[in-house]
């Protein structure tokens, strides 16, 4: 095998070399774990036009405003995996950050949707995800000390959701006023750092642990 036993960066370079020979490339991202996302981020930062994707397919946790609650839980889950490492990259935020630097054509997939004229998505079931999200989210917010920081996270997650949505065909039809609300990547990085510095945020992570 060309990649067996090689360091991750070399593996990415081999894959990139193969991809550069394909004229039309679409990519399916099934979930947002960093081990799956890191290759995409590496390629997007490569900025080689031969690696441009025609379309990137993502799980639909972005098409409706109420899905921002799900994004809050995704952000928290990612932070909790390695809460002892303050420099840890949050995968969902890393994806949005990369997309702001290198905008892509996105399509959101949910259970039952046909894509590429031959494949059918099995996940996510948006109704099931919403029910599970509401149960967990509401349970956290019962703690009065955490309600305010959860609201901060919700507002932040909604901004991330709008960024992803703006790169879909449906989202591109947004009014110009909505598009103007999308800022540069560093603005969101600064806001995320501010939220993580809130004392109640540390209390929230301790509560969830």
Show which residues each predicted segment covers.
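Short acidic, S/G/P-rich loop/turn micro-motifs used as interaction or catalytic elements
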Residues: 2-6, 34-35, 63-65, 127-129
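Generic alpha-helical structural element
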Residues: 4, 29, 84-88
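Flexible, acidic/histidine-containing loops and adjacent segments that form or flank the divalent-metal
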Residues: 42, 46-209
């Amino acid at each position: 095998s060309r990649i067996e036993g090689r360091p991750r960066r070399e593996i990415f370079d081999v894959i990139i070399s193969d991809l550069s020979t394909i004229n039309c490339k679409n990519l399916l991202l099934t979930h947002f774990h960093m081990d799956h996302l890191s290759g995409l981020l590496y390629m997007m930062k490569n900025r080689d036009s031969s690696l441009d994707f025609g379309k990137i397919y993502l799980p639909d946790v972005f098409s409706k405003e109420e899905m921002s609650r799900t994004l809050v839980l995704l952000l928290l889950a990612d932070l909790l995996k390695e809460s002892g490492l303050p420099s840890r990259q949050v995968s969902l935020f890393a994806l949005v950050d990369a997309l702001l630097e290198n905008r892509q054509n996105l399509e959101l997939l949910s259970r039952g949707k046909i894509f590429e004229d031959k494949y059918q998505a099995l996940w996510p079931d948006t109704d099931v995800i919403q029910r599970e999200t509401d149960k967990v989210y509401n349970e956290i917010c019962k703690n009065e000390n955490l309600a305010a920081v959860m609201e901060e996270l919700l507002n932040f997650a909604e901004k991330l959701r709008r960024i992803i949505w703006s790169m879909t065909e449906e989202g591109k039809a947004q009014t110009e006023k909505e598009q103007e609300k999308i800022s540069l990547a560093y603005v969101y990085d600064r806001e995320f750092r501010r939220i993580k510095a809130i004392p109640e945020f540390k209390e929230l992570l301790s509560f969830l642990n």
